[in-house]
A protein has these predicted regions:
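C-terminal hydrophobic helical "lid"/dimerization subdomain
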Residues: 1, 222, 250-254, 298-353
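Glycine-rich beta-strand-centered segment in the early N-terminal region that forms part
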Residues: 20-34, 45-95, 118, 138-140
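Mid-domain Rossmann-like dinucleotide-binding core that forms the NAD(H)/NADP(H) cofactor-binding site
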Residues: 79, 136-221, 226
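NAD(P)H dinucleotide-binding glycine-rich loop of Rossmann-like/cofactor-binding domains
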Residues: 88-174
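Glycine-rich phosphate-binding loop and adjacent beta-alpha segment
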Residues: 209, 245-313, 351-353
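A short acidic, Gly/Pro-enriched loop at the edge of an enzyme's catalytic core
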Residues: 228-237
């Protein structure tokens, strides 16, 4: 079969591989829509170590082509939504207290695509524990909306969940790329009173306002911390870091109240280091909670995301502002995401077989 792969650090292209075979609890699928994520390009450039001949991609809606003999809930021809994180549910690590199912066999190990197996930019790909990880595409939910639920929406919302946004809170969202935009939307759904979004690109700013941002702050207008403190007349209740660099953590700690929360959903390079001045963290006595996490996976999580879409609570498909047709266009969409033109939010590729 054909797939689009990382071929070493900074290298990518088409390769041929053997078609996967479904294990007893697994399914083999072929994508009908895929979205390109900055994590795909980041991985290709060696952000998590060198990948050689590893098929990329982790955001997809797909058709079931094979199921294992223990799979009960899916059959050939079903159109399903595939969460980006597909835990091995039998792993004992998922039974730990306060366990996030993203870490079934180690750090982020439930994120099988890219980390331990080929991804979805292929004619066929496999999903482990199909009954516990896949979800039938609900009637009334578009393929475009569903493919955005698999990662962008789930990840952005997880940031808001970690931040523990309460009714009437003021929240700051660092970065309004696709994940940050979903954090803005999630904060509105959770009842935030004021949502301050940090970003500069005009189309992202416009969409942030549509999703619920009440204020936009730009580094081009001066020091971010000073701007936010002036806007709020003091510190804010919580912050979600969905973009930026290690310095964003320092900025977040400077703007969040005592007893507040800083939630990080931004992936950092191994070369980056947090250097937190003790004053920013109240000499270690501020009771500010610092959390960072990878979005949960599995069918139940995805059903909840799709329920919000089906009932008109959110329209994540608005993130998709570049659309391609045909499997071979994955290459063009990948290059686009790697180059990141200023007007890009998110590309999708629709596939007909």
């Amino acid at each position: 079969m054909k797939g689009y792969a990382a071929l070493g650090i900074g290298k990518h292209g088409w390769i041929e591989k053997e078609k996967p075979v479904a294990g007893p609890m697994d399914a083999v699928l072929r994508p009908i829509a895929v979205a390109i994520c900055s994590s795909d390009t980041h991985a290709m450039h060696g952000g998590a170590g060198e990948l050689i001949n590893v098929i990329l991609g982790h955001e997809t809606v797909a058709e079931v082509t094979e199921v294992g003999n223990m799979v009960q809930d899916f059959k050939l021809g079903d159109i399903v939504v595939v969460p980006c994180s597909t835990p091995n549910w039998e792993k004992i690590a998922l039974q730990q207290r306060n366990s996030n199912n993203a870490h079934d066999e180690g750090l982020m190990a439930s994120f099988k695509f890219l980390l331990s197996k080929d991804g979805v930019f292929a004619e066929f790909f496999s999903v482990n524990n199909a009954d516990a990880n896949l979800v039938l595409l609900p009637e009334g939910v578009s393929v475009d909306a569903a493919v955005m639920a698999t990662d962008m929406m789930s990840t952005g919302f997880y940031g808001v969940e970690m931040a523990d946004v309460q009714l009437g809170d003021t929240i700051v969202v660092f970065g309004i790329g696709p994940v940050g935009l979903m954090a803005v939307a999630g904060a509105k759904l959770r009842g935030a009173g004021r949502i301050i979004a940090i970003g500069t690109r005009p189309n992202c700013v416009a969409l942030a306002k549509e999703y619920g941002a009440t204020d936009i702050v730009s580094y081009k207008d001066g020091d971010l911390v000073e701007q936010i403190l002036a806007l709020e007349g003091g510190k804010v209740d919580c912050a979600v870091i969905a973009g930026g660099n290690a310095a964003s953590m320092n900025q977040a700690l400077q703007i969040v109240k005592n007893n507040g929360t800083v939630a990080n959903i931004n992936f950092y390079d191994a070369s980056e280091t947090f250097n937190i001045p003790t004053y920013d963290w109240g000499f270690g006595m501020s009771d500010i909670t610092i959390r960072g996490g990878f979005c949960p996976g599995g069918a139940l999580r995805m059903k909840k995301m799709l329920n919000l879409i089906k009932n008109g609570r959110i329209a994540p498909e608005k993130l998709l502002n570049y659309k391609f047709e045909g499997f071979d266009k994955i290459k063009d969409a990948f290059i686009l995401m790697d180059e990141k033109p200023k007007d890009l939010i998110k590309p999708v590729v629709h596939i007909k077989w």
